[in-house]
A protein has these predicted regions:
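Active-site helix-to-loop segments that bind/position phosphate- or nucleotide-bearing substrates
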Residues: 1-130, 136-145, 149-169, 182-187
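Active-site "cap" helix and flanking loop/linker of ATP-utilizing ligase/carboxylase catalytic domains
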Residues: 171-174, 178
């Protein structure tokens, strides 16, 4: 962050953490700081976890398979959820230009990563979701990926959502400001 903000370039670590809302003035982690950086934010906020499962067809014996709960800081959850999705997403076979048969997920992984990242970063962190234990739910069905993220779309109109023009509204501005400076192994 020192490289991107001349205002913070000369600040010490404590001041930077406070001024970027990672910590409070007394040094305690904020909710955004906890979710983004703590080793196990689910200890004090269990709803910050996410679950994923492959939903079986109605005629199959059982409801789901490969149920997994994801925890840890937001960047690690993103990486773990993406790896799980890559393992469980159905694939299609196609012949490449070189004549070799290849398998590709039914949804491009770059798109999946963006969807998961948006669900994690833009989820509602208010008392009516966290306090009620609402967490992110990801489900793979035979023909689609469904991600339910607590809360709603705040700051965007239906017209903006339906438009091809880019519209942006950070639901959790402090969290977004923190995680935009973080990196995962895949970027």
């Amino acid at each position: 962050i020192r490289q991107t903000s001349r205002r913070l370039r000369e600040k010490n670590d404590t001041d930077i953490l406070r001024q970027t809302s990672v910590t409070t003035a007394s040094g305690e982690l904020t909710l955004a700081g906890l979710y983004a950086l703590a080793s196990y934010p689910q200890g004090s906020r269990p709803a910050l976890a996410a679950t994923a499962a492959v939903i079986l067809p109605a005629d199959a014996p059982g409801r789901h398979q490969n149920l997994q709960t994801f925890d840890g800081p937001l960047p690690e959850m993103l990486s773990d959820m993406l790896r799980w999705t890559e393992r469980n997403l159905p694939t299609t076979a196609y012949y490449g230009d070189d004549g070799n048969l290849r398998n590709a997920p039914i949804i491009p992984l770059a798109m999946v990563r963006e969807i998961i990242a948006n669900a994690l970063v833009h989820r509602n962190l208010g008392p009516y979701t966290l306090g009620l234990g609402k967490s992110i739910q990801m489900r793979i069905l035979p023909d689609r990926l469904v991600i339910e993220s607590p809360g709603g779309v705040i700051g965007l109109s239906i017209h903006q959502l339906e438009s091809s023009e880019h519209a942006q509204a950070a639901v959790n501005q402090r969290l977004y400001n923190i995680v935009r400076h973080l990196r995962t192994p895949d970027g």
